[in-house]
Amino acid sequence: MIGLVGKKVGMTRIFTEDGVSIPVTVIEVEANRVTQVKDLANDGYRAVQVTTGAKKANRVTKPEAGHFAKAGVEAGRGLWEFRLAEGEEYTVGQSISVELFADVKKVDVTGTSKGKGFAGTVKRWNFRTQDATHGNSLSHRVPGSIGQNQTPGKVFKGKKMAGQLGNERVTVQSLDVVRVDAERNLLLVKGGVPGATGCDLIVKPAVKA
């Protein structure tokens, strides 16, 4: 089963009939329009390419305009691709709504996490801080030793150090689907998802469900 592209609206909470508060993320899933269907003969694999939302005409490049015109769909804010399973069939120009998830219990959500800039090891990797006193006057938040001796004489790859934090592709798996609102094109999932408000999210049925 393919996924859909949506937009993060924000977080809120809803209550069950028993009065239990459930924190949910609201994802707006506008109709995904099929722009291309790839097959084994021409592309070597089966997939469907979709777009969603709208893009100003003066922001659409000529190659994009031709691609959207060939498919007969309105220019969207981007292009995304989903692999097709055996038996799944879609046609160019077809519109896919959030009702795709009507019978889905859990989903995986992929997005770009918030960028935090250059961060130290305490914030980036949850390193423990060193003593505030007891003779320590300079090394409160430094990482400490990053290696051994003349042997091996190098810092190993993957060593946790200070650097860019966030702004990377992150997937949160197996989030419960709390509600599918087809009228307002909304999908409510339990818990938080990566990224800032307004960012694009890829929602797929959970692989571990």
Curated annotation (Swiss-Prot):
GO terms for cellular component: cytosolic large ribosomal subunit. Methylated by PrmB. Keywords: Methylation, Ribonucleoprotein, Ribosomal protein, RNA-binding, rRNA-binding. Disulfide bonds: none annotated. One of its GO terms (biological process) is translation. GO terms for molecular function: rRNA binding; structural constituent of ribosome. The modification N5-methylglutamine is found at Q150. Pfam families: Ribosomal_L3. Part of the 50S ribosomal subunit. Forms a cluster with proteins L14 and L19. Belongs to the universal ribosomal protein uL3 family. NCBIfam families: L3_bact. One of the primary rRNA binding proteins, it binds directly near the 3'-end of the 23S rRNA, where it nucleates assembly of the 50S subunit. This is Large ribosomal subunit protein uL3.
